[in-house]
Swiss-Prot record:
Catalytic activity as recorded in UniProt: phosphoenolpyruvate + UDP-N-acetyl-alpha-D-glucosamine = UDP-N-acetyl-3-O-(1-carboxyvinyl)-alpha-D-glucosamine + phosphate
Protein name (record): UDP-N-acetylglucosamine 1-carboxyvinyltransferase
Record's GO cellular component terms: cytoplasm
UniProt source species: Buchnera aphidicola subsp. Acyrthosiphon pisum (strain Tuc7)
CDD domains membership: UdpNAET (cd01555)
Modified residues (2-(S-cysteinyl)pyruvic acid O-phosphothioketal): C115
Family the UniProt entry places it in: Belongs to the EPSP synthase family. MurA subfamily.
Annotated EC: 2.5.1.7
List of catalytic residues: C115 (proton donor)
Length: 416
């Protein structure tokens, strides 16, 4: 998927079924390396990043069958250096390192790829593994890691909150000798889901979801069954789609408690919101949204992966709104494309200032990353005229059947 034709002036109404969380599914797939037992994992989204992860696992010797529910057997792993052409495609491939080290005592991987959003250093991953006793050499863009015997449990104080590094350390510590404490850990729902999965296999992890996670190392893990949590970012994206178009939507198979900050901001913008056990209903019919002031922050704060979508919302809202990005630098590239569509946006350091206008205009735009792709497609849906969104190959990395789902609620999107 390279280029999309998006018809504008659409009001988006209807029902959407939310897919499994990419940000939980990817690390969980790599965590299967930790055990010889047979595993079943359900609610796996059909995404290019997921498919690349599966190819990586198969290359290592993992046996995988199924589609949305996968049966995985990692008992026959016999390769410890995945190929560059796969590693380079997704940044999540760094999560292979901890499980290989913990179970086999060795791993060699090239520096990973993925979305180009500023600087995303892996120092915290490597420092954590070093503190657990691993020897790590970094040369020619390749990480060569090994440990004699088992990794050793340790108290680890994270220099800064990092979801990725928390996952790496937690997975490696699962099979370490002794206990590990991760202080200043990330608290995201995906961390909780990964810990739940590992505990299902026999790990001893408590505290996931707080800033202090305690892992008591075990000798080995067994098999088990797990259901991946819903994708909170996909949910938030569809809620913004309805809000920005002055429509109404019900998101099914989702988890409202994972979106507290997003729902608060949508309510502040004027949306009527109702929630149930696994659904969220938003109604913005006949109302132009009110502008919002937002600051991204680690969970339970406002998610960085939703700031582009809310920048779109601010662009067509009443008043002047601001969004301050505190997680990643260089994450405002998409704003130049919204400006091309008529948005009045100024950037000041790590803050964007949006002066809302009633209507965007169609244009030929280019997406720079995953969330920018979704945002520009939504912008095309509500703008006047026909918008062409280029470089949408990013989209299938993190949204399952996004154009198809939008078309079901009133959009008219075609692959060119």
């Amino acid at each position: 998927m390279e280029k999309l034709y998006v018809e504008g002036n659409k009001i988006l109404n209807g029902h959407v079924i939310i897919s499994g969380s990419k940000n939980a599914a990817l690390p969980i797939l790599f965590m299967t390396i930790l055990t010889e037992g047979k595993i079943k994992i359900g609610n796996i989204p059909n995404l290019t990043d997921i498919n690349i992860a599966l190819k990586l696992l198969v290359y290592l010797g993992v046996k995988i069958t199924g589609n949305e529910t996968l049966c995985i057997d990692a008992s026959s792993i016999n390769i410890f250096c995945p190929p560059y052409n796969l590693i380079n495609k997704i940044r999540a491939s760094i999560w292979i390192l901890g499980p290989l080290l913990a179970r086999f005592g060795k791993a060699k991987i090239f520096l990973p790829g993925g979305c180009k959003i500023g600087s995303r250093p892996i120092d915290l991953h490597l420092n954590g593994l070093t503190q657990l006793g691993a020897t790590i050499n970094l040369k020619n863009n390749c990480i060569d890691a090994y440990v004699k015997g088992r990794l050793q449990g340790k108290y680890i104080l994270m220099e800064k909150i990092s979801v990725g590094a928390t996952i790496t350390i937690m997975s490696a510590a699962t099979l370490a000798k002794g206990s590990t404490i991760i202080d200043n850990a990330a608290c995201e729902p995906e961390i909780v889901d990964i810990a739940k999965f590992l505990n299902t296999l026999g790990a001893d992890i408590i505290g996931a979801g707080s800033n202090k996670i305690c892992i008591k190392g075990v000798l080995k893990l067994t098999g088990g069954t797990h259901q991946v949590i819903p994708d909170r970012i996909e949910t938030g994206t569809f809620l913004v789609a309805a809000a920005a178009s002055q429509g109404h939507i019900t998101c099914h198979k989702t988890e409202p408690k994972h979106l507290t900050n997003v729902l608060m901001k949508l309510t502040e913008a004027g949306a009527k919101i109702k929630t149930g056990k696994d659904w969220i209903k938003l109604d913005m019919r006949g109302k132009r949204p009110k502008s919002l002031n937002i600051c991204t922050a680690p969970y339970p704060g406002f998610p960085t992966d939703m700031q582009a979508q809310f920048a779109l919302l601010n662009s067509i809202s009443k008043g002047i709104g601001t969004i301050t990005e505190t997680i990643f630098e260089n994450r405002f590239i998409y704003t130049s494309e919204l400006i091309r569509m008529g948005a009045k946006i100024k950037i000041k350091n790590n803050t964007i200032i949006c002066c809302g206008i009633p209507k965007l205009i169609s244009s030929n735009v280019f997406s720079s990353d995953l969330r920018a792709s979704a945002t520009l497609i939504l912008a095309g849906c509500i703008a006047a005229g026909i918008t062409i969104v280029n470089h949408t190959y990013h989209l299938v990395r993190g949204y399952e059947s996004f154009p198809k789902k939008l078309n079901k609620i009133g959009a008219n999107i075609k692959i060119i």
